[in-house]
Amino acid sequence: MDSKEVLKEYFGYDSFRAGQEDIINAILEKKDVLAIMPTGAGKSLCYQVPAMMLSGITVVISPLISLMQDQVKSLNDVGINAAYVNSTLSESEIDGTLNMVLNGIYKIIYIAPERLESAKFCEFSKQADISMVTVDEAHCISQWGQDFRPSYVKIVDYINSLPARPVVSAFTATATNEVKTDIECILRLDNPKVVITGFDRKNLYYSVEHISGKNRDRYISNYVKEHIDESGIIYCATRKNVDTLYETLSSMGISVTRYHAGLSNEERKRTVSYTHLTLPTIRLV
């Protein structure tokens, strides 16, 4: 199948969005790629489609467990065999997953950047036929960005340790010129195809309110009550802030759940499942 046939067969689309086909063609020509595209523009398809066409497997480096789980579920739902390896799995489950990859069961495997340093994964990588390494949320590699993750800087060491250098593709929705340069340099992208489709999302409205700390919780509580028939996501700076706001809204009788790394695997799974159900109705962030 060619890329358009893969797109139709697995994802049900007849045509590509802006930038997607250029990225996919570059990957299939074994060229490194850096893509800067807004959220919702279809970045994932840009590596998932060629992953189905390349001879080996694709390793996707993703910073969040919830993102991995969501992507893998979506792929499995459309008939693409994908898996993840992260801290929610037992050692025996990890061993089983990696063996299934080696046996050709899975074409795409999602991992956290920290996993690249584990002896088990490094040994697996030496045995696996890795055609592409995809770096999702690639802005995490840059100290210019507020989401800097030190483990992202070591991705290039992992790539260099592989028996044969794979295609390297990097994707982000947010990158200043400094961050873009960092991604190219730190990952040592080889004369990459750079695709920038813009940042503007015409379906979103942005508003900024300057609220002092002591009035913040009251403002949020009132705002939620005013939009009681709508669903939304509230991002907080710390786990403690998440827990405090969760308790406040719960005490008001508002249907609310929470998600952060300090929760049990079971509670995080429940939250992800709940979010999947409510995602189509989310109107506020």
Model regions and ranges:
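The conserved Walker
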Residues: 39
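Hydrophobic/aromatic ligand-binding patch that stacks against planar heteroaromatic rings
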Residues: 25, 50, 74
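Helicase motor core with emphasis on the C-terminal RecA-like subdomain
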Residues: 28-29, 34, 69, 73-277
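Conserved pre-motif I regulatory segment
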Residues: 1-36
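Single conserved hydrophobic/aromatic residue that forms the stacking wall/gate
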Residues: 276-285
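Conserved Walker A/P-loop ATP-binding site and its immediately adjacent core
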Residues: 57-75
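Walker A/P-loop NTP-binding motif
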Residues: 44-57
